[in-house]
Amino acid sequence: MLDGIRDAVRKFLGGNTSYEVAVEEFIKDIQKALISSDVQVKLVFSLTNKIKERLKKETPPSNLERREWFIKIVYDELSALFGGDKEPEVNPKSIPWVIMLVGVQGTGKTTTAGKLAYFYKKRGYKVALVGADVYRPAALEQLQQIGKQINVPVYGEPGSQDAVGIAKRGVEKFLSERYELVIVDTAGRHGYGEEVKLLEEMKDIYEKIKPNEVILVIDASLGQKAYDLAKRFHEASNVGSIIITKMDGTAKGGGALSAVAATGAPIKFIGVGEKIDELEVFNPRRFVARILGMGDLEAIIEKMKAMEDYEGIQKKMGEVMTGKSKLTLRDMYKQIVAVRKMGPLSKILQLIPGMNMMGDIPEDQVKVGEQKMQRWLSIMNSMTYQELDNPSIIDKQRMRRIAMGSGTEVEEVRELIEHFNTVQRTLKMLKRRKKDVEKLFGQMGG
């Protein structure tokens, strides 16, 4: 899908034609690639017009060549077409968390329920499945097979036609057994064009089980037709997000993604294959980076972001020191990512004033430091937003879940929390000293 765009980037960056001619050729190539992927013609020409406007109005920064700057503009506008800077909230906002899956027949909804269960289980959550699709005879059996494969329990009532009752009883059972995340697979008996009936059924089950989140499953082969379904769903559900399946098996994936993004409905995951682990968190910028050719784009983006990251961290630490803001694990995560972008730890240490006077730090110690940073990032990736913003709630049970989800030991999670607490105490001490110095100078001035 959208391979033509990647080819156009290679041709543009490596070509020998003049810049102006190369730009015109690239714009024609990108229009052709998007239209063949079933993106609406109106959206395609709107995109290329925005690119042309920016080329006229903006000047390339000094550290980028003109061709690199052009690709950066294309990257920005394609990202906006597929959803912009929206980072999907993957981790549950609270525990327990109930997800209700809805979708028309043939979208791969039941398979997606299993993939979703596997995704969260790998992150350390205690997950269960409820099979409430009573209209497709093999749905429950399929879900049970998937549950057995990934070692996740499945609740169902063979032969029953009471979809609402099954959903209610299944959710109640698993919540009483202290499961952290319950996924309900609902009926998908309606086809494309029957969105109203689908949404009515969704409402009935929703009122009985009161899920925290409703996810609509859409087949990528719908292309731009996905707009109507996504729009109705987005208007009907204020806790809704979308999974687009079968992205690997159709040329219309770009059309489906752009159509859904145009409705404002958040796309949370995309299905990229039949295997149980082939469900990806959808990040528009990462997706666009991939279709543009990751290697070519990364160097350009890193040049643009290096200074932004550094300035952002400086600003945050200034706010913490003045008491305007508090330090969180989310801030620590950003700091580690920013440090790693600057290059190997050994080179970074050489840049710190005074380090060269202390002699060389043993290479094995530097390597341990780099490994620890990577493991800490993995640990923080397995935390909920609540935990990242308020680490004080992380008790022994949460530590065990986080360790399991990140493939680390509980002791490593505890070490990270203790390090964070030490940093907080140090900052408080520095803040007090700063106030004492200001007070002293005030007295001297008086």
From Swiss-Prot:
Gene3D superfamilies: P-loop containing nucleotide triphosphate hydrolases (3.40.50.300), Signal recognition particle SRP54, nucleotide-binding domain (1.20.120.140), Signal recognition particle, SRP54 subunit, M-domain (1.10.260.30)
E.C. numbers: 3.6.5.4
GO molecular function: 7S RNA binding; ATP hydrolysis activity; GTP binding; GTPase activity
Annotated compartments: Cytoplasm
Enzyme class: hydrolase
CDD domains assigned: SRP54_G
Superkingdom, taxonomy of origin: Archaea
Main location: cytoplasm
Record field: catalytic activity: GTP + H2O = GDP + phosphate + H(+)
PROSITE patterns, per database record: SRP54
Family: Belongs to the GTP-binding SRP family. SRP54 subfamily.
Name of the protein: Signal recognition particle 54 kDa protein
Natural source organism: Metallosphaera sedula (strain ATCC 51363 / DSM 5348 / JCM 9185 / NBRC 15509 / TH2)
